[in-house]
Amino acid sequence: MIRLAFRNLFQNKVRLVISVGGVALALLLILSLDAIFTGVERQVTAYIEYSGADIWVSQADVRNMHMASSSLPDSVARKVKFVPGVASVSPILYLTNNVVAGDERNLAYIIGLPENTELGGPWDISSGRSLPAEGEAIINRGVAEKSGIALGDEVEILGDEFKVTGFSEGTASLVNSVAFISMKDFEEMRGSYDTISFLLVKVSDGESPEAVAARIQTQVRDVTAQTRNDFAAQERQVIKDMSTDVITIMNLIGFLIGLAVMALTVYTSTLSRRREYGMLKALGARNTDLYLTVLAQAILSVILGFLFGLALTLLLTIVIPIFGSNLVLEVSRISLLKVGSVSLVIAAISAMLPIRQIAGLDPAMVFRGR
């Protein structure tokens, strides 16, 4: 039956392209929406993920960066440094503000970095300096291109002028970017020299970040210590909570449209072969054989459509960033598993719907030319 289904499916190339193409486009819609949401989540936590820190220490009960404020006395850095298992501690200052160039205003995480820090700085420099000195700023390359900023130009950050000395990659999302200035400049503009926002902690070799975070939480008062993974997860959860309704509705609508198109494609493709099934019955095929043939054809169509739709989605993940868009698509394993499994179920159901008509076919209609 599988061989028969395969031959029947590939017998008419035009019909094959229509059925597989319809399924592929439907699945492309579903996979693309999932990839966009996964990509946005990845972009939002990129700074945390690439900070190089094993543990993030913040003010008590502050568990994320987005729309949050953390303030710690600088003495906390010395206390954390003496916790067993801590190899190094790097303080940073943080605020959400605009990078202003002419009439262009770009929302950004403004990060104040200590001199020669090994943690928390830009991880991918396309041109210029890798760390800002006093009076300097490193901004995202895409933001710079959109605003017409070149190396050596000045931008306004936190109400002061900074010379752009470096462009970073991977530090922009659909909603904001990350800009880096020196901690000294940050302190002077804020008018405070004895507080920090976050501590980025590197653990000693052989130490567990979870165990060291627990020690910091126990031994240092009024702080929250989280591993990098936990801190990133909290950041993603905040974004999800803020956009849950919109994203859920978009995903649901796209998913339902995609499944409806796929179900209709499989259904009409199955009915279009009624004459062929009638001929099989005339030649002595049992209804069970027809059922298996129909099901096999539907599943083959969906598998081919899924592979084609996945290829198109992966192509989009490469092409879209090339055109300078801050939109990043990322296909996740969970998305592939969800879409693939549901697609097979829908394919089976869609193929079963016309089976009653196929089972009731009169073999004589083949010879009557109907």
Question: Where do the PLM segments sit?
Answer:
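N-terminal Sec/SRP start-transfer signal
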Residues: 1-28, 41, 46, 295
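Peri-transmembrane interface segments
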Residues: 36, 215-260, 269-274, 279-280, ...
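Mechanotransmission and gating elements of multispan inner-membrane complexes involved in transport
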Residues: 83, 156, 160-163, 167-249, ...
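C-terminal membrane-exit region of the final transmembrane helix in multipass inner-membrane proteins
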Residues: 331, 335-370
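Hydrophobic, regular-secondary-structure patches
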Residues: 28-108, 127, 214-218, 224
